[in-house]
């Protein structure tokens, strides 16, 4: 009842609009006295196009009538007497009106409730941005549904007019035949006597004059009916075009844009069910009007009357055929896109769908769809209607599929499950363009027969641009091409033109979307992260994001030219960050344990005033996909330390958490979180003791300079010494202590050279898998790789 209470508070034009909703089809008194009952019924749960829901609609009609009768019976007194009669009359009237078509009652009440809600929302003027967005969307959908209701009513009106025209014309033909019969009777008068002939002739002449006058008037009436019907069809087609433009050029294009952004990690494009229901309603109404126009043409051919109608009907017939053609060709879409980075000799899938397949009898003769790969230039020629028949740029295996109709969902679609690109033919490259910048597209084409083969349409649709690679090493640069295209493609572009430059804030949005999707995290790029990226890209030291908002980024800056002073592009560095996080550090990033986007100087500034043992994790500048540890520890030599970066290869040997656990002098995660509180849940569990008599070795992260410090300390309890066993390491029998050689461990820049020792470590790890008594003394590992039982293998 809350809805009706709000509706009663409407004023001015809104109140007048609400009053127009009611009439003999549904009196406003019924809405008022049964407000609570009406608002509690499941009107939206009924599918108006499903005959099986008729029974539920009948129950609602019966319930409405019973509620009215009950309300009438409870009226007492003088005023109640009149209301009792009125409500009883309404109950009878509604029963008679909707008894044969209960679904129309549901349609009527839904229309009323939708418009009431719209008027109330407009009056309230929602103030929140989210509310405005949702309201705007619901408003648009409501407007579409209202237009469909209007189209249904005008189509029903022209159907009634057509029937009236047909009945009038049939009666006219009967009377015309009567006129011919009278003329035949005149010819027979010669056989009668003069007196009888004169008497009969006078009567026949009077009858003929009267009939011819009537025929002349009726001919004009018929012509007027025909013109009025053609004019109504013209108006209907104008409304149909407008509705179709909203659905195909606005709603469907927006869905395709969402699908494109989903390729960059944006939110899913959403279901096609609502769009399909709209397209199917369009198809039904268009087809009904086309059939009406054809019947009108048949009536004109049956009884030709000179006038403008033939030309008008020919025009509306051509118009409605164009409308059907646009609907069928535009609703042949790719529901599931092929991969946009497409590797040769690799299986891939795609799904195409016809959104009107269940309404125009297309599914009665299931069409076959063919997929071919074409170049960007071939796609341009195709859209210009140039002759490109049978031209392609490669060979796709398993590229033909028959569309299937799914009765339960009402969808007509073709699922390509096992396609494979056997070969690709590349075009001549332009300038500095690499093979990973060359764009192709998968062309899907078919032929649809509509309405029992009355109309046949050749349909084609292009996939989003794809970049073809032959080796996994090309994947990263190909992804950059796809990212740029998906993010910055403009509506209605020539294939596959994109801006060469975009504003930095636009690129930030695309990077953040891709980052969250790849890392599968809600923790996106912060303002500080974006400042760091801007500093890196523009080689600028400003720490204010606003300073970069007006700067443009070219494609060359993004992934063609190396960053100043480095041997990689901006995208290659950023992609390496995403890859290492995705493969190894998603939980640590989500926990906020990885600061990441800070350079060495910024790390120094953050740590300099922190207690010894405070550390942070940042992405390496020198190594793509590298993560380095920076920590504070005062010593005579220095007070800030940086380890040589770890990469994906290193983390596949020993996890980040275990490496941090090995280094006991790392105590606090910046700014002040205890290390074990953050990382202990990710430590590898301690292995059970061996049962075969052998002690199992463990790999342990060691920083040799700190091990030296530990040995020099002679057992002191300083927290920076690497004295405690790793959380993942069991105490083991002591080994001989080898002297450490730190000469190449910390470089001049204060970073540990992991690459120089990792191969040796792997070799020793392999040796340690053998029984200890079988190792020849000649296989002793190099100096500096073993520590005591408190240490471990580096």
UniProtKB/Swiss-Prot annotation:
Its main location: cytoplasm. Coiled coil: none annotated. SUPFAM superfamilies: p53-like transcription factors, SH2 domain, STAT, Transcription factor STAT-4 N-domain. GO terms for cellular component: chromatin; cytoplasm; cytosol; nucleoplasm; nucleus; RNA polymerase II transcription regulator complex. The keyword Transcription regulation applies. It is found in: Cytoplasm; Nucleus. One of its GO terms (molecular function) is DNA-binding transcription activator activity, RNA polymerase II-specific. Keywords: Activator, Cytoplasm, DNA-binding, Lactation, Nucleus, Phosphoprotein, SH2 domain, Transcription, Transcription regulation, Ubl conjugation. Residues 773-794 are annotated as: Disordered. PROSITE patterns: SH2. The modification Phosphotyrosine is found at residues 90, 682, 694. GO terms for biological process: activated T cell proliferation; B cell differentiation; cell surface receptor signaling pathway via JAK-STAT; cellular response to granulocyte macrophage colony-stimulating factor stimulus; cytokine-mediated signaling pathway; defense response; development of secondary female sexual characteristics; development of secondary male sexual characteristics. Tyrosine phosphorylated in response to KITLG/SCF, IL2, IL3, IL7, IL15, CSF2/GMCSF, GH1, PRL, EPO and THPO. Activated KIT promotes phosphorylation on tyrosine residues and subsequent translocation to the nucleus. Tyrosine phosphorylated in response to constitutively activated FGFR1, FGFR2, FGFR3 and FGFR4. Tyrosine phosphorylation is required for DNA-binding activity and dimerization. Serine phosphorylation is also required for maximal transcriptional activity. ISGylated. Residues 589-686 form the SH2 domain. The modification Phosphoserine is found at residues 128, 193, 780. InterPro entries: p53-like_TF_DNA-bd_sf, SH2, SH2_dom_sf, STAT, STAT5_CCD, STAT5a/5b_DBD, STAT_linker, STAT_N_sf. SMART domains: SH2, STAT_int. Belongs to the transcription factor STAT family. Carries out a dual function: signal transduction and activation of transcription. Mediates cellular responses to the cytokine KITLG/SCF and other growth factors. Mediates cellular responses to ERBB4. May mediate cellular responses to activated FGFR1, FGFR2, FGFR3 and FGFR4. Binds to the GAS element and activates PRL-induced transcription. Regulates the expression of milk proteins during lactation. Forms a homodimer or a heterodimer with a related family member. Binds NR3C1. Interacts with NCOA1 and SOCS7. Interacts with ERBB4. Interacts with EBF4. Interacts with CD69. This is Signal transducer and activator of transcription 5A.
């Amino acid at each position: 009842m809350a809805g009706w209470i709000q509706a009663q508070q409407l004023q001015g034009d809104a109140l007048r609009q609400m009053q127009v909703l009611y009439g003999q089809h549904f009196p406003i008194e019924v809405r008022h006295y049964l407000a609570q009952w009406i608002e509690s019924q499941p009107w939206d749960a009924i599918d108006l196009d499903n005959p099986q829901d008729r029974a539920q609609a009948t129950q609602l009609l019966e319930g409405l009538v019973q509620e009215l009768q009950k309300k009438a019976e409870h009226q007492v007194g003088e005023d109640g007497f009149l209301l009792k009669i009125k409500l009883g009359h309404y109950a009878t009237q509604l029963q008679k009106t909707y008894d044969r078509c209960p679904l129309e009652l549901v349609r009527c009440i839904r229309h009323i409730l939708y418009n009431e809600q719209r008027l109330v929302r407009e009056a309230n003027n929602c103030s929140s941005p989210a509310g405005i967005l949702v309201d705007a969307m619901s408003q648009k959908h409501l407007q579409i549904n209202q237009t469909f209701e209007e189209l249904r009513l005008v189509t029903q009106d022209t159907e009634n007019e057509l029937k009236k025209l047909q009945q009038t014309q049939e009666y006219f033909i009967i009377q015309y035949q009567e006129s011919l019969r009278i003329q035949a009777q005149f010819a027979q008068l010669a056989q009668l006597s003069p007196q009888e002939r004169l008497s009969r002739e006078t009567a026949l002449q009077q009858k003929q004059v009267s009939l011819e006058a009537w025929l002349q008037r009726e001919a004009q009436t018929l012509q007027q009916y025909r013109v009025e019907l053609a004019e109504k069809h013209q108006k209907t087609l104008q409304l149909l075009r407008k509705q179709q433009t909203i659905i195909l050029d606005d709603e469907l294009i927006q869905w395709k844009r969402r699908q494109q952004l989903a390729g960059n990690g944006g939110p899913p494009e959403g279901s096609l069910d609502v769009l399909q229901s709209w397209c199917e309603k369009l198809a039904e109404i268009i087809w009904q009007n086309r059939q009406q126009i054809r019947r009108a043409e048949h009536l004109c051919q049956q009884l030709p009357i000179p006038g403008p109608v033939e030309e008008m009907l020919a025009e509306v017939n051509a118009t409605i055929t164009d409308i059907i053609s646009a609907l069928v060709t535009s609703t042949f879409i790719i529901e599931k896109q092929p991969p946009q980075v497409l590797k040769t000799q690799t299986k891939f899938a795609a799904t195409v769908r016809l959104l009107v397949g269940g309404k125009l009898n297309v599914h009665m003769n299931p069409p076959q769809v063919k997929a071919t790969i074409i170049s960007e230039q071939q796609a341009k020629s195709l859209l210009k209607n140039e002759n490109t028949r049978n031209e392609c740029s490669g060979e796709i295996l398993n590229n033909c599929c028959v569309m299937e109709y799914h009765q339960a969902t009402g969808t007509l679609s073709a699922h390509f499950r096992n396609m494979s690109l056997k070969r690709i033919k590349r075009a001549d490259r332009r300038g500095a363009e690499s093979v990973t910048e060359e764009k192709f597209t998968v062309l899907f084409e078919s032929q649809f027969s509509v309405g029992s083969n009355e109309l046949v349409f050749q349909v084609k649709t292009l996939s989003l641009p794809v970049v073809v690679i032959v080796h996994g090493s090309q994947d990263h640069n190909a992804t950059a091409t796809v990212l740029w295209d998906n993010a910055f493609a403009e509506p209605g572009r020539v294939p596959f033109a994109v801006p060469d430059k975009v504003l930095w804030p636009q690129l930030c949005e695309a990077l953040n979307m891709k980052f969250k999707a790849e890392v599968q995290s809600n923790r996106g790029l912060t303002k500080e992260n974006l400042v760091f990226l801007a500093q890196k890209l523009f080689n600028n030291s400003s720490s204010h994001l606003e300073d970069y908002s007006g700067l443009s980024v070219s494609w060359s800056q993004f992934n063609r030219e190396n960053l100043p002073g480095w041997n990689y592009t901006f995208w290659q560095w950023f992609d390496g960050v995403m890859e290492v996080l995705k493969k190894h550090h998603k939980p640590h990033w989500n926990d906020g344990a990885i600061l990441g986007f800070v350079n060495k100087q910024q790390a120094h500034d953050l740590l300099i005033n922190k207690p010894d043992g405070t550390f942070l994790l940042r992405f390496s500048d020198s190594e793509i996909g590298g993560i380095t540890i920076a920590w504070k520890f005062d010593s005579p030599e220095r007070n800030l330390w940086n380890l040589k970066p770890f990469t994906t290869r290193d983390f596949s040997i020993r996890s980040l958490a275990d490496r941090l656990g090995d280094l006991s002098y790392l105590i606090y995660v910046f700014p002040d979180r205890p290390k074990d509180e953050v990382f202990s849940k990710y430590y590898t569990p301690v292995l059970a003791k061996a049962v075969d008599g052998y002690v199992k070795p463990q790999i342990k992260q060691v920083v040799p300079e700190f091990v030296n410090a530990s040995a020099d300390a002679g057992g002191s309890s300083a927290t920076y010494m690497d004295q405690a066993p790793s959380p993942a390491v069991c105490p083991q029998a002591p080994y001989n202590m080898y002297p450490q050689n730190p000469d190449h461990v910390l470089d001049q820049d204060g970073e540990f050279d992991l690459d120089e020792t990792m191969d040796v470590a792997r070799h020793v790890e392999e040796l340690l898998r053998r029984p200890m008594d079988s190792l020849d003394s000649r296989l002793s590992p190099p100096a500096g790789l073993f520590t005591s039982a408190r240490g471990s293998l580096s």
